[in-house]
Amino acid sequence: MATRRPGKSYADAAVPGSTPGETPSELSSDTSPAVPMHVIYKLIGFTIAMITTPVGMYFVSVTFGASTTVAGIIAAVMANIILFLYIYVAWQEDKEEREADAARRKGAKAQ
């Protein structure tokens, strides 16, 4: 049979780094989102563009006299353009973050 350790309840053991005398207000709580909101907004925007642009271009092409095959090719090309734009925007954002980290490290070394 398991023995109970004195001074530590199950709730205390479940929270790493907590001691029996700590109150909940003393514990650090990180409620920040895992992903910044501007990243979520970009993802939502590109998702909407990825859905509406190819479908819209397909129907516009068919309406103006193109065959369905040509309209499908145009829709596929537009989907690829939006995908490459998303990759480029994400790459630029990552590049800016790396440059900011390098500047912070350089500033920390100078001090």
Swiss-Prot record:
Recorded hits in InterPro entries, A to Z, give: Vma21
Membrane topology per record: Multi-pass membrane protein
Q: Which residues lie on this side of the membrane: Cytoplasmic?
A: 1-43, 91-111
Transmembrane ranges, per UniProt, are 44-64, 70-90
Q: Which GO terms describe its biological process?
A: vacuolar proton-transporting V-type ATPase complex assembly
List all topological domains (Lumenal): 65-69
The protein's UniProt keywords, in alphabetical order, are: Cytoplasmic vesicle, Endoplasmic reticulum, Membrane, Transmembrane, Transmembrane helix
> What's the name of the protein?
Vacuolar ATPase assembly integral membrane protein vma21
Q: Which organism is it from?
A: Emericella nidulans (strain FGSC A4 / ATCC 38163 / CBS 112.46 / NRRL 194 / M139) (Aspergillus nidulans)
Question: Quick one: which gene encodes this?
Answer: vma21
